[in-house]
Amino acid sequence: MKAADVRSKSVDQLSDELVKLKKEQFNLRFQAATGQLEKTGRVTEVRRDIARVKTILREKSQAGK
């Protein structure tokens, strides 16, 4: 996910995206623990996407003040 794509979304969309990414991260963690995870790089990718979304949400909340 590109930062430009994240910035173009509304706060509600970003919140929904954050929930979706956290669920995916949870599932990936379980797959890794049970040895079923094939794409190990996806864990890092999802973690960074979560950080990106949180950063943009914080920027948008600070801009509103």
From Swiss-Prot:
CC per GO annotation: cytosolic large ribosomal subunit
Coiled-coil segments on the chain, per record: none
Keyword Ubl conjugation (UniProt): no
Keyword Ribosomal protein among UniProt keywords: yes
Signal peptide: none
A Pfam family this chain is assigned to: Ribosomal_L29
UniProt-listed GO biological process terms: translation
Source superkingdom: Bacteria
Family: Belongs to the universal ribosomal protein uL29 family.
GO MF, one example: structural constituent of ribosome
SUPFAM superfamilies: Ribosomal protein L29 (L29p) (SSF46561)
Keywords from the named record: Ribonucleoprotein, Ribosomal protein
Gene3D superfamilies cross-referenced by the UniProt entry: 1.10.287.310
Name the UniProt record assigns to this protein: Large ribosomal subunit protein uL29
Lineage of producing organism: Bacteria, Pseudomonadati, Pseudomonadota, Alphaproteobacteria, Hyphomonadales
InterPro entries, A to Z: Ribosomal_protein_uL29, Ribosomal_uL29, Ribosomal_uL29_sf
